[in-house]
Amino acid sequence: MVAFGAFDLYAGDIASRQLRYQLLRADRSSIYFGRLLGLCITLVAVLSLLGLVVTVYLGLKLGAYPWGEMLLWALQGTLMMVVVSLPYTALCGWISTAAGGSFTSLTLASLAIGGVPLLASLGSLQFDSAQYVNWLLPWGFQSRLLHHDPLQQGLAIGGCLLQTAVFVWLGHRTFLRRDL
């Protein structure tokens, strides 16, 4: 879902040369971080709405748990979906700044997000250490976001935030040096 929302964060406007008109009124960092922040706010709103709809549906249909527990479960699940989506959003932003067009950006983002676990699983058939390729993206630790141990959750959240920071830095660096 994130790849389809973030793949054209910058690529379409870079390809059509529309960003050069914004450069008269704003600097590159403001454009980069403004668009990224806007996408993150939209992503949080969509995931919150999704969590609310699922919770209300399960609460009305099943009725097996009290509403307080259901809302806490939904809050935790939604928060973890947001946390795991941040690195993918930043990765798509980086790819979008580097790609020459929208379709190229979508293709590269899909290959990166889907290719990492595929490469890890196929590579681990031959080499056991190839499974560590999963750690390039949150694939390696995203299942620990819903772990019962707070330490495991904290480490997974920290890993997602660290990857987000790295991808945002790479995207910003690429955007600053890119010909718009």
Where are these regions (language model features)?
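Short, solvent-exposed coil/turn segments
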Residues: A3, I14-S16, Q152, V168
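Residue-level signal for alpha-helical context at structural boundaries
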Residues: L24, R28, L49-L50, W67, ...
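Secretory targeting signals
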Residues: M1-D8, F33-F103, P150-Q153, G158
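Terminal transmembrane helical anchor/hairpin motif
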Residues: L106-R177
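Membrane-interfacial segments
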Residues: A11-I14, Q18, V53, Y57-P66, ...
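Helix-loop-helix units of permease transmembrane domains in multi-pass membrane transporters
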Residues: L9-C40
